[in-house]
Amino acid sequence: MLRRGSQALRRFSTGRVYFKNKLKLALIGQSLFGQEVYSHLRKEGHRVVGVFTVPDKDGKADPLALAAEKDGTPVFKLPKWRVKGKTIKEVAEAYRSVGAELNVLPFCTQFIPMDIIDSPKHGSIIYHPSILPRHRGASAINWTLIMGDKKAGFSVFWADDGLDTGPILLQRSCDVEPNDTVDALYNRFLFPEGIKAMVEAVQLIADGKAPRIPQPEEGATYEGIQKKENAEISWDQSAEVLHNWIRGHDKVPGAWTEINGQMVTFYGSTLLNSSVPPGEPLEIKGAKKPGLVTKNGLVLFGNDGKALTVRNLQFEDGKMIPASQYFSTGETSVVELTAEEVKVAETIKVIWAGILSNVPIIEDSTDFFKSGASSMDVARLVEEIRQKCGGLQLQNEDVYMATKFEGFIQKVVRKLRGEDQEVELVVDYISKEVNEIMVKMPYQCFINGQFTDADDGKTYDTINPTDGSTICKVSYASLADVDKAVAAAKDAFENGEWGRMNARERGRLMYRLADLLEENQEELATIEALDSGAVYTLALKTHIGMSVQTFRYFAGWCDKIQGSTIPINQARPNRNLTFTKKEPLGVCAIIIPWNYPLMMLAWKSAACLAAGNTLVLKPAQVTPLTALKFAELSVKAGFPKGVINIIPGSGGIAGQRLSEHPDIRKLGFTGSTPIGKQIMKSCAVSNLKKVSLELGGKSPLIIFNDCELDKAVRMGMGAVFFNKGENCIAAGRLFVEESIHDEFVTRVVEEIKKMKIGDPLDRSTDHGPQNHKAHLEKLLQYCETGVKEGATLVYGGRQVQRPGFFMEPTVFTDVEDYMYLAKEESFGPIMVISKFQNGDIDGVLQRANSTEYGLASGVFTRDINKAMYVSEKLEAGTVFINTYNKTDVAAPFGGVKQSGFGKDLGEEALNEYLKTKTVTLEY
């Protein structure tokens, strides 16, 4: 026998604890709160001899009735207790038959006659959600907030014949937070603490220790019940009073006003303490000043000139939307569920079926409220999901915001993934039916998880190089947009879910993103063909295919980034331990070129994200569309807001601001050497941010006479003409040994003549248009310079006579070392050939290395000793032997000399986005 104080205690195998002082209870009331009080009282050993509750509604029993029936407790479902002021005889007999010693009323909407109230030995106790004697009446919580009280709480009191006037048994209080709503206050304090207090009150009565403290009349107030008809907003008041009125009716009954002839209810009010953001005016009946629909919600104004923001709006038909979307006509992005999330959805479907017992099958289109659910069922749904879905805490408004099952599951999944539930992704698309599919292209800046116009509304045309037509207008990011994107990325890193996420979960999101890229590869490749002129078949395999591989590769690295332990000299007689940690840098900027729009994004951003950073990425001004489509897919994959930000626009404005921004800790750039130098300078002067640069190239390809000539011709052409020559590692100069030079040139020209130049969406096309008009003109000038300097134009050198920016594949021979063609990169389909004397290995190496560039290089020979010697001597970040363009996601890629420094791809790329911290401790 164990003893606690003076009470005898016995423990049984069921785990329930029984004290000596226990009571027989009648529970009178309803709701989830009533159910929880019932369950906790039974758990503490009290015997509930009867539950008196309301009748089933639309075939659904109240949660309290369900719990009691499951336990075998007698349940009485009474439509009323009295008629014409007198207790119904049958009801009184049923009540007295259970022999209760105490009535417990946790939440009761019915009038209980006094003879029932006074019948038990210990009378009756009632839970009331205010600090009595203040706010007597049925809408106590509402009035606590409406009146701007700084303290809220509840009272458990002894019932008498007055209206909430009985003696106090116990009270509890809490501070009212500035933006508390009725729901927030109830969920945070009144519900959980109220359950505990009811159980404590019953035990105090059982122990004979329950006080009866008369309520003072000083400070007593009584307010009437708040219903929809008297919850209309009166606008001639201060912002704080308006705020209190709105939150004091949130969620029930809901403060409302008239907008465009329709009743609109406001939810989620907060006082605006900062400057009023820009927005679109919205006329509101009775308001002296129009509201403003902003990206953060609907801004309202009091008569004192101060403002508040409302987060959500509900219309007469029950539909609820984020207030920021009042004028929006965009489409809502759909989250695609993982296998684990599908299981959660099935669990929730069972919960819906239990609540909507009158609905035979829960379908995607099933509407929670149109199927008969009430506000009480909302509380039950939220609580059951919390219990059965790993503690997931929804808010009541989540149900109102997504009343149909399919939409509700979307909201739940977003919540599970740690996304902001306040605003869903809305995408305004430019849609085109092309390549036998409907291509849907976002065209706005993507900042903090939302597509948005540029701050100043500026746009520019993005051009289809196949015919020179305008694809669409794209937002032209301003300095303000860059600053917003950086701020969003910083907040996501320092305060958001991303910064708290474990590495394996980060990898899961990246795997999911890779899957989505693969699932949408036809659309992405089509956009790449439209926007950059990439041949569709090549775009599928390389532009998109390698992007998928890159994200999968780095997703696997997420949980394998680790430091090391290092033996150091011990501080004897103590000991020391030194270890290193690899940590993310923070906010990273990424600026990518136009030749592989999505692949260049993937090469840099995958490593950046795997390391745990957040990013702001500026795509090339002429090819922004796949980057913006990528942003949409990142939301579908579940990336939290602010982790990925895409800002289309110019290098001179957006790119320069990124290089100068003090909150950016790393910048990764692929582009020209002159721009790379400017970026490096700006990064150094601003805050010495870490930089990795992949810049220009003039990659030499040496072809010896002992090579496999057929392969050398085929690979040599690929080295130059792959992706229209718009390839950073393209062979900028071919050195062909004298004895095979003429045959090599002849074969190359023969093969060029077989190439089909045309529409990149045509599956038989080999060679598409150059990326943009200015680049085509630069290539034509390059050829003119070569001819003027005396190089021999063997083939091509002209624009193709058809619409668009097409250029003939071009071959120059007799290129001497002093010529412009020998020194400068064309970045186009121009083969520059120089011959070298038979056997002069060191001489050709000297010529190959006499450039400031060092990105890639190649050699073709059957002699392995010669191949290895040449690979050692070539000054380049990559050397290809008897192959070319063979890059892989696991192999580091990057240049030397003025081709830059730092690596993309492979494990080494992770180090570009990590910092090493050394920790030493003594013990």
From Swiss-Prot:
Binding site for NADP(+): 592-594, 618-621, 651-656, 671-672, 694-695, 778, 825-827
Ranges where the record places region Hydrolase domain: 23-331
InterPro entries: 10_FTHF_DH, ACP-like_sf, Ald_DH/histidinol_DH, Ald_DH_C, Ald_DH_CS_CYS, Ald_DH_CS_GLU, Ald_DH_N, Aldehyde_DH_dom
Carrier domain mapped to chain residues: 339-416
Annotated localization: Mitochondrion
Keyword tags: Acetylation, Mitochondrion, NADP, One-carbon metabolism, Oxidoreductase, Phosphopantetheine, Phosphoprotein, Transit peptide
CC terms in the record's Gene Ontology section: extracellular exosome; mitochondrial matrix; mitochondrion; nucleoplasm
EC code(s) of this entry: 1.5.1.6
PROSITE patterns associated with the record: ALDEHYDE_DEHYDR_CYS (PS00070), ALDEHYDE_DEHYDR_GLU (PS00687), CARRIER (PS50075), GART (PS00373), PHOSPHOPANTETHEINE (PS00012)
Record note on modification: Phosphopantetheinylation at Ser-375 by AASDHPPT is required for the formyltetrahydrofolate dehydrogenase activity.
GO biological process terms, semicolon-separated: 10-formyltetrahydrofolate catabolic process; biosynthetic process; fatty acid beta-oxidation; folic acid metabolic process; NADPH regeneration; one-carbon metabolic process
Superkingdom in the source lineage: Eukaryota
Record-given protein name: Mitochondrial 10-formyltetrahydrofolate dehydrogenase
